[in-house]
Amino acid sequence: MAEGDTGSDQRQNEEIEAMAAIYGEEWCVIDDCAKIFCIRISDDIDDPKWTLCLQVMLPNEYPGTAPPIYQLNAPWLKGQERADLSNSLEEIYIQNIGESILYLWVEKIRDVLIQKSQMTEPGPDVKKKTEEEDVECEDDLVLACQPENQVKTLDFDVSENRTEIEELPPIDHGIPITDRRSTFQAHLAPVVCPKQVKMVLAKLYENKKIASATHNIYAYRIYCEDKQTFLQDCEDDGETAAGGRLLHLMEILNVRDVMVVVSRWYGGVLLGPDRFKHINNCARNILVEKNYTNSPEESSKALGKNKKVRKDKKRSEH
């Protein structure tokens, strides 16, 4: 048994070294000890139209008797298209049992992306559909969690009369939380306009590890003195309801002029509701650390107020 494990380890290490040598910066180590890796695959390196992130975890039995545990991450990959690609990867494994297959998987995905780019253009319709689905999932939750003060939720493209500061704000990174091979890390930046939100996201995505996260959930709140209102918005990035929960936490803490992004790297084990606890704990910790929160008494009052709103909402639904 030990000899088999040693042989698997050696073959895995050789394959990992080969992948890093072949793909360079596209290949990303998420967790070396847990053997979780990620690679960003595009149809074209110079002018990518379609991109997909393949995340893999190598079990001890791979490549001898077990396949890699994998996840395909792309906002446009849904339904039959996702099923077809998954079937293709599983066929490759069946045809090459006992062999190292990561390279074959990557190149198969690249072939699919190239074919897709030749058949269609990634027009606004694809992106718009994804955004609308995300908004529909969150609308009820955000409305139920709104505090009594007037709040305005805006899309990035809406132009505001408020003077926009185009300087990239400083970004702080929180201490990661790891549970059952999933890792969560919060990132915080002061923001005073939606354009800065976009700048912060762009800067974070320059980091290949953050860009390859399974989910990058974020929320922001900007206070407009002249209108006595908040501009606020949130994004699930595929983790349903996580953005709304994060925004609700920021409302409870009564923070303003700040955005929080929480990156999650999925480790292959489902966490259930615990994932929301870790997302909010990451966010709360960095908000407290950077002195964005009110006193505990004020936060408790706000929490009570929000609970009352949610309870009234629930009663009306039943």
UniProtKB/Swiss-Prot annotation:
**Superkingdom of source:** Eukaryota
**Locate the RWD domain: which residues?**
14-116
Major subcellular location class = cytoplasm
The keyword Flavoprotein is assigned to this record: no
Annotated GO MF terms: actin binding; protein sequestering activity
The protein's UniProt keywords, in alphabetical order, are:
Actin-binding, Cytoplasm, Differentiation, Neurogenesis, Phosphoprotein, Repressor, Stress response, Translation regulation
CC annotations in GO: cytoplasm
Key word Signal present: no
Pfam families linked: RWD, UPF0029
Region of interest: Disordered: 294-318
Write out the biased-composition intervals (Basic residues): 304-318
Q: Provide the positions where the record notes the PTM Phosphoserine.
A: 295
Output the GO biological process annotations, alphabetical, semicolon-separated: cellular response to amino acid starvation; GCN2-mediated signaling; intracellular signal transduction; negative regulation of transcription by RNA polymerase II; neuron projection extension; positive regulation of neuron differentiation; regulation of cytoplasmic translational initiation in response to stress; regulation of translational initiation
What parts of the sequence cross the membrane? none
The record's listing under InterPro entries reads: Impact, Impact_N, Impact_N_sf, Ribosomal_Su5_D2-typ_SF, RWD_dom, UBQ-conjugating_enzyme/RWD, UPF0029_Impact_CS
Instruction: Indicate where this protein resides in the cell.
Output: Cytoplasm
PANTHER family assigned: IMPACT-RELATED (PTHR16301), PROTEIN IMPACT (PTHR16301:SF25)
* Protein family according to the UniProt entry: Belongs to the IMPACT family.
Role: Translational regulator that ensures constant high levels of translation upon a variety of stress conditions, such as amino acid starvation, UV-C irradiation, proteasome inhibitor treatment and glucose deprivation. Plays a role as a negative regulator of the EIF2AK4/GCN2 kinase activity; impairs GCN1-mediated EIF2AK4/GCN2 activation, and hence EIF2AK4/GCN2-mediated eIF-2-alpha phosphorylation and subsequent down-regulation of protein synthesis.
Instruction: Spell out the subunit comment.
Output: Interacts with GCN1; prevents the interaction of GCN1 with EIF2AK4/GCN2 and inhibits EIF2AK4/GCN2 kinase activity. Interaction with RPL39; this interaction occurs in a GCN1-independent manner. Associates with ribosomes; this interaction occurs in a GCN1-independent manner. Associates with actin; this interaction occurs in a GCN1-independent manner.
Q: What is this protein called?
A: Protein IMPACT
User: Which species does the entry assign this protein to?
Assistant: Bos taurus (Bovine)
Gene symbol of the encoding locus: IMPACT
